[in-house]
Amino acid sequence: MDMRRLVGRNVRRIRERRGLTQERFAEISGFSQQYISGLEQGRRNPTIVTIYELAAALGVGHMDLVQPDEEQGA
């Protein structure tokens, strides 16, 4: 799987489990809603620093954003 898509899917899955809208997550993370949207659609190529910052804003470890979701069997 493409790493951009994987990170985007994981961000969306975790964000939704936390009950956060893209707008609220943007406020918490410091990234724009447009960036979050593009990221979740697999159109952004986040740096490792960005992955750490997104993970911190979601309250998870950075590895949670780069590993396939076991529930999806990916």
What is the predicted function of each stretch?
Residues 1-17:
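A short, Lys/Arg-rich alpha-helix, primarily the initiator
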Residues 20-38:
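Short alpha-helical DNA-recognition segment
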